């Protein structure tokens, strides 16, 4: 039933094992660390380079090895000093002047309901997604020039108004303004219309009517203060 094993099966085969050969470790060349020059050393190098004008020439091949070395050391020292002195721009927030801290919002497409602005009625009613406003919006350049126009009008008006009453040749006392736009003292105007109701300046018939010159009262007070 059972097969007898042969004697040859009990023998073991010899296997040749090759040992790996260890390669000699390759030594990497040591990296020379360049010394950091201080400011005093840089100053000495600058004096030495300034005394030798050939260092500033581009023909490095004509210069000697000492000159080239000093020039490179100077560039390295200047670069190292600049990197250490300048702060990193991305690490800190740039501080701006107080008068420049403005928040400007420009709406190039105002979502205003066109139908409601033109007619005052919108078929969508409260469900309209646009703004129901009938205000008049001015452009930015128009707002910037409005104050200049008002200032010019004020200067023109001040130049047109005499700084003293033309009847009494004195400062205005309770000034009045006629329908033709001329200014007089109240007392002078009353005395004038008793004789002649025409304007003393243009000759137009005033019909004895004049109103208080409220726009001239601040000017009159300023002249009195002076």
From Swiss-Prot:
Name a GO molecular-function annotation.
DNA binding
Q: Would the keyword Lipid metabolism turn up in this protein's UniProt record?
A: no
- State the compartments where it is located: Nucleus
Show the PROSITE patterns listed in the entry.
Answer: ZF_C3H1, ZF_RING_2
Zn finger regions (RING-type) covering which residues?
A: 165-203
Q: How does it assemble?
A: Associated with the spliceosome.
- What this protein is called in its record is Pre-mRNA-splicing factor CWC24
Write down the species. Answer: Candida glabrata (strain ATCC 2001 / BCRC 20586 / JCM 3761 / NBRC 0622 / NRRL Y-65 / CBS 138)
């Amino acid at each position: 039933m059972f097969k007898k094993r042969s004697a040859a099966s009990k023998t073991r085969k010899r296997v040749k094992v090759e040992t790996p050969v260890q390669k000699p470790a390759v030594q990497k060349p040591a990296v020379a660390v360049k010394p950091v020059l201080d400011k005093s050393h840089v100053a000495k190098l600058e004096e030495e380079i300034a005394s030798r004008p050939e260092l500033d020439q581009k023909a490095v091949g004509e210069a000697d090895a000492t000159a080239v070395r000093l020039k490179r050391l100077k560039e390295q020292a200047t670069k190292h000093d600049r990197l250490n002195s300048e702060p990193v721009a991305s690490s800190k927030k740039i501080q701006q002047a107080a008068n420049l801290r403005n928040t400007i919002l420009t709406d190039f497409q105002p979502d205003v309901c066109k139908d409601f602005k033109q007619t005052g009625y919108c078929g969508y009613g409260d469900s309209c997604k646009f703004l129901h406003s009938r205000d008049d919006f001015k452009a930015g350049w128009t707002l910037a020039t409005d104050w200049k126009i008002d200032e010019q009008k004020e200067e023109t008006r001040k130049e047109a108004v005499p700084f003293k009453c033309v009847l009494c040749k004195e400062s205005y006392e309770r000034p009045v303004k006629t329908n033709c736009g001329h200014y007089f003292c109240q007392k002078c105007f009353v005395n004038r219309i008793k004789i002649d109701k025409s304007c003393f300046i243009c000759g137009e018939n005033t019909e004895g009517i004049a109103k208080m010159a409220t726009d001239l009262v601040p000017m009159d007070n300023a002249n009195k203060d002076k």
